[in-house]
Amino acid sequence: MVHATSPLLLLLLLSLALVAPGLSARKCSLTGEWDNNLGSNMTIGAVNDNGEFNGTYITAVADNPGNIKLSPLLGIQHKRACQPTFGFTVHWNFSESTSVFVGQCFIDRSGKEVLKTKWLQRLAVDDISDDWKATRVGYNNFTRQRTVEE
């Protein structure tokens, strides 16, 4: 049964239809400073016309935390999407290992940018028989660092 509230419901649906495109049109940007759920920090520079970027990464987690150093990263993203997919490699300056991250830049329901990533880390091993233990897999969620004004 349809009651007198139908015009109100129709008005609400029409309002949502008009407002929703504006909400999804905001583009998520990789450029800037990010923190992850483990306390690591990443800075991504400007993304060029080909979608390429570079930056730096400082991890909060390591097998030998006393040796942690700022490490370079190099990546690429799809430029057309409002919530682009991307990938980057980190060349760890303090260990014989390399990590690759893949993910997507999202704008969450509260309007904040979030990077959802999965990663592989390859450790150097001395013998092929140790290959089985040389690759780690995980995930990180990054949020944009707050600025002083926030």
UniProtKB/Swiss-Prot annotation:
GO CC annotations, alphabetized: extracellular region
Gene3D superfamilies, per the entry: Avidin-like
Domain Avidin-like per the UniProt entry, residue ranges: 26-147
SS bond partners: 28-105
Residue numbers binding biotin: 36, 40, 57, 59, 63, 95, 99, 140
GO molecular function, one term: biotin binding
Glycan attachment sites: 41, 54, 93, 141
Database matches in InterPro entries: Avidin (IPR005469), Avidin-like_CS (IPR017889), Avidin-like_sf (IPR036896), Avidin/str (IPR005468), Avidin/Streptavidin-rel (IPR051764)
Keywords annotated in UniProt: Biotin, Disulfide bond, Glycoprotein, Secreted, Signal
A Pfam family this chain is assigned to: Avidin
Family recorded in the similarity comment: Belongs to the avidin/streptavidin family.
Function, in words: Forms a strong non-covalent specific complex with biotin.
Subunit structure: Homotetramer.
Name of the protein in question: Avidin-related protein 7
Organism, scientific name: Gallus gallus (Chicken)
Gene designation: AVR7
